[in-house]
Amino acid sequence: MRILLYSGKGGVGKTSLAAATAIRLAQMGKRTLVMSIDPAHSLADSFDLGGALFEAQTSDPLQIGPQLFLQEVNINREMKRHWGAISAYVTSVFRTSGLEGVEAEEMAILPGMEELSAMMYVNQYRRSGEFEVVVLDCAPTAESLRFVSLPTTLEWYMKHVFGLERSLMKAVRPIANRLGPVKLPPESYFQNVQDLFDKIAGVDTALEDSSVTSVRLITNAEKMVLRETQRAFVYFSLHGLTVDHIIVNRVLPDEVQDGFFRSIREEQNATLAAIEQYFAPVPVRRVPMFPNEMLGFDRLTQLASKLYAEGEDPAAITRVTRPFTFARDGDHYE
């Protein structure tokens, strides 16, 4: 299974390009899932599906075309499906502090839960082979980096803290629960954590395997956006992932000759030259600005035709080496 991550600064067009890529893959006969791992989902909106996913109230993949499936992780559903014991304990703690009802349940949704739920699905599909390609519409850069670092972070916790914490709680729980109003986590809480870790086991290896996972960084021909893309490029490499394309979205097309856009074009040309120079030898693709919003299957198909050549496979493996590698030297990396 191929995993394609579309990441970049918020507002650069990640969702539209991920959706267009998924359409092209499905048209080529590949069973494709496009999944949003952004807490502020807009993937269904990009396909102009209206309230289809909202009305379905599901976290499961929804078929939206031949060989094409869409998934937006619904964290409230995931809490019941995968986080039962953890959610129940955290909710009980908040209720002890005075929060009741919906407020306590909402506060029990901890940072990272949505990303970890998405990671579990990716690993599930990798193991089952249900899809040939999974296209991930990532959150803005910082959240995307947290997503790819989750397996390493959780592995460290499981190796160095979890066992000790679990044993300590088992020993002191009978006494502590009698003395204070806040109960210590039950054994089911720790078993739930162990089950979650088991569900993502091995996904870090898949993410670092360039024959499985590729990162596509989306940027605009703007200096501020470029700087964040440069940082993301280094950070993804630091985490062991391979960036195989830089995609510059919303480039002014040649037919725009109005004088109002002259200075914008000059700035874009200067930034495009800097992009080519900085990211070489990683291929840089340019996608023109369209005169209308890229919304719905027809326009996304049109977008795909500008992003990929006719007959080109977006899932093809084009790079297997990372431009940056890092090695630890004492207390720093080189």
Predicted regions and their residues:
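C-terminal lobe/tail of nucleotide-utilizing enzymes
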Residues: I200-E334
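Flexible phosphate-sensing "switch/lid" loops adjacent to ATP/NTP-binding sites
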Residues: R2-S7, V12, L17-M28, T32-S210, ...
